[in-house]
């Protein structure tokens, strides 16, 4: 009772003191390509835009493994699986900034606008997206959605061309973020539509303040966020490509969270009483994409030889330092349609040389990024190991280190031979790997880095999405995995463990297995 009385006595004194603003600084590894998330597909850009600024109709709860309400409070699906009716949450505020003052809350017009700009080539906003809509196109959204219409001020009807078991989880992906139609109208009337990509407006937990490329992104907490004001007043992305420097900043207190640490830094952090290690198995696959449109990689035997030449065990130990498991196919092993009966390519340089006998092989290019990431902790070393393995099998290759933004842009154009890359599933559905990485539509959008278009594989992917039961889908996806393995479209590398390092005073942060970031409930203890 004394403790309670003492607390009550102090309360007025505590309330009289102005609270110091709490800032959460996150050391990230790269700059976002922009903030109009529909134009991009990298996690770096999704983290800096969709994850902090925007919301979607639904979200995917990684812990529960289910789709949960967000801007849509509830939804219903017709018996034929073609019509989805969404009831929108009322009273959701878009961000109020120096450059935009919303006159209304979110309604059906915003949802219709957000989808129509991706779906309708005649829509004026479709034409101003300089980078197109790669993720929506690779997921075949224009072919899937027949129409999106307003059926009430806070109700939207989406009608599909055909049933698709992946549609609802797809709506949790970053590219399905909902924009303010009112802000878009303001920009179009002012003749500055490009500002949607540089001065973003959303309804999410944080409000955009400023971006300095390769240095910093600044955000402020959204006091009107429908799920409650964030626990911190400001969020900073301190762009720090060097993992060693990220750790140094964390130790000095310049950052409270450091993303994508090197495996050795994780072990070092475990011994530091001021730091915490957060981790989870990542729903991701690191791989080298083999561009099947570039001879001699158009020959399956050459691609198979590359897989046989590669020493995966040595690579994992040297690059991931024991923090990842070997990838033998496209899926992480915890995927529900993972085909366990498909054997890995063994490390067999002699067999690789036999497959290449008599072939005149030009020198190949190995493309990699300059700075490390979760899916590629040591890009330079990894590329050198692959180069040496290929040389042992009689394949000459040179290494090109290319800045991340340029690498993605040029890889989408198919300029690469061998490309170190990684893919993170967004929602736990197996199709989230297949459609964006192996469909013919995704060759056009640029995300199919193997540049492989096969009608038989396309049919397996389409049939898998249309199937009504998980058992049917699993059978189809097993066939797809077998075809991809036989054609050797990828050189699978690893399934990493996702790590983040935080200071002890950080509370409420969790690592997401899909690589998404949620800082809305993260607090910094004083």
Curated annotation (Swiss-Prot):
GO terms for biological process: dipeptide transport; protein transport. CDD domains: PBP2_DppA_like. Gene3D superfamilies: Dipeptide-binding Protein, Domain 1 (3.90.76.10), Dipeptide-binding Protein, Domain 3 (3.10.105.10), Periplasmic binding protein-like II (3.40.190.10). Residues 1-21 form the signal peptide. InterPro entries: Peptide/Ni-bd (IPR030678), SBP_5 (IPR039424), SBP_5_dom (IPR000914). GO terms for cellular component: ATP-binding cassette (ABC) transporter complex; outer membrane-bounded periplasmic space. Keywords: Peptide transport, Protein transport, Signal, Transport. Pfam families: SBP_bac_5 (PF00496). The keyword Signal applies. GO terms for molecular function: peptide transmembrane transporter activity. SUPFAM superfamilies: Periplasmic binding protein-like II. The keyword Protein transport applies. The complex is composed of two ATP-binding proteins (DppD and DppF), two transmembrane proteins (DppB and DppC) and a solute-binding protein (DppA5). Five orthologous SBPs (DppA1-A5) are present in P.aeruginosa, which increases the substrate specificity of the DppBCDF transporter. PANTHER family: D,D-DIPEPTIDE-BINDING PERIPLASMIC PROTEIN DDPA-RELATED, PERIPLASMIC BINDING COMPONENT OF ABC TRANSPORTER. DppA5 was not able to complement the DppA1-A5 penta mutant during high-throughput screening. Belongs to the bacterial solute-binding protein 5 family. Part of the ABC transporter DppABCDF involved in the uptake of various di/tripeptides. This is Probable di/tripeptide-binding protein 5. It comes from Pseudomonas aeruginosa (strain UCBPP-PA14).
